[in-house]
Amino acid sequence: MDSKKYSTLKERFLRYVKFNTRSDDASETIPSTPSQMEFAKMLKKELEELGLSNIFINKACFVNATLPSNIDKKVATVGFIAHMDTADFNAEGISPQIVENYDGKDIVLNKEQNIVLKVEEFPNLKNYISKTLITTDGTTLLGADDKSGIVEIIEAVKYLKEHPEIKHGDIKIAFGPDEEIGRGADYFDVKEFAADYAYTMDGGPIGELEYESFNAAQAKFKIKGVSVHPGTAKGKMINASLIASEIIEMFPKDEVPEKTEGYEGFYFLDEMKSNCEEGEVVYIIRDHDKAKFLAKKEFVKELVEKVNKKYGREVVKLELKDEYYNMGEIIKDHMYVVDIAKQAMENLGIKPLIKAIRGGTDGSKISFMGLPTPNIFAGGENFHGKYEFVALESMEKATDVIVEIVKLNAER
């Protein structure tokens, strides 16, 4: 099934996801992978073909464009943002599969490798009976996070351009790199974007509307041991691997991702590597509540002090850095931005699902740059892996929401 209202939506999505735009946390370049710049150049060309204005790629690989106002009064400028990169999972040779009129049963993604999208494991599938699903072939992610957001924004401005009877102010759009590795928005230029408020199209199922995110930090423990021949090690050896395990044991056992939900924060053991002489343990710290976030950071500082005191020397050094903050701190003073999106959904018969993100978006950083930017659903499910899928109808609804926000903005 193709979209009747947005005739190029499905084709555009299927084409875009085949671009491998996986970002690379180990890279120090901007963007982190060359393929993102290639994709940006392709997007720029297609936006030019649509006849948008002020189209450019800035030095940080953000594709910017404007759909100029067609109204004779001053209205606010609204922006829509999505990211080009995909998560740290195989994205080479993405081969999307289309499941028409989904029957509610298990979906075989890859017969040869016996990879099955099972309803028992993913009961969210039951929400999509009779819909058109786009899945992976079981060997890659899909990239609906966030190619669906890009497609929805482009299809919305295309629709508005084709329907000049819909009055609107200036509409700004931007597609950026490296969201998945938490760096892209560091280089977002709010002044250059020139919107009064914006939305990221980077959420999950229909109805999601998010204006609160985690506060986030990374704690890196660098451990220095003393390596001595095991046969003569008594009183001399300090085993960095054992210190690494001590550090891990000191963390609270229930404040972990797999045991928390809602507004509960956590410590997540992200990485560890060690031998006798040296080691490194990396945790990420997350909490919506600022006071609890600060307390968690204080906990890791005290942990290091305790370990060093035990060994009578500095065996552990801590590198603690903040990554992003809860955008709700900013958006709470601009709740009209949330109210407009909520009203747009209700006008379309969509029930808004307002909840705090257990993560972050580009909007987490952009909001603190002075541009309030909540997050709206883009339709995908099971992000960052081979079981990712999106319903065509969900992407249509997200596109409808963009158009409706634009209408409401012009009426304010």
From Swiss-Prot:
Subcellular location: Cytoplasm
Binding site for Zn(2+) 2: 145, 180, 384
Catalytic residues (positions): 85, 179 (proton acceptor)
Needed co-factor(s): Zn(2+)
PROSITE patterns: ARGE_DAPE_CPG2_1 (PS00758), ARGE_DAPE_CPG2_2 (PS00759)
Note on cofactor: Binds 2 Zn(2+) ions per subunit.
Gene Ontology process terms (BP): peptide catabolic process; proteolysis
UniProt catalytic activity: Release of the N-terminal residue from a tripeptide
Alphabetized InterPro entries for the sequence: ArgE/DapE_CS, Bact_exopeptidase_dim_dom, Peptidase_M20, Peptidase_M20_dimer, Peptidase_M20B
GO CC terms, sorted: cytosol
Binding positions for Zn(2+) 1 per the UniProt entry: 83, 145, 202
A single GO molecular function term of this UniProt record: zinc ion binding
Enzyme class: hydrolase
CDD domains the UniProt entry points to: M20_peptT (cd03892)
Keywords, comma-separated and alphabetical: Aminopeptidase, Cytoplasm, Hydrolase, Metal-binding, Metalloprotease, Protease, Zinc
EC number: 3.4.11.4
Any Pfam family: M20_dimer
Homology family: Belongs to the peptidase M20B family.
Purpose: Cleaves the N-terminal amino acid of tripeptides.
The protein's name: Peptidase T
Organism the protein comes from: Fusobacterium nucleatum subsp. nucleatum (strain ATCC 25586 / DSM 15643 / BCRC 10681 / CIP 101130 / JCM 8532 / KCTC 2640 / LMG 13131 / VPI 4355)
Taxonomic lineage of the native organism: Bacteria, Fusobacteriati, Fusobacteriota, Fusobacteriia, Fusobacteriales
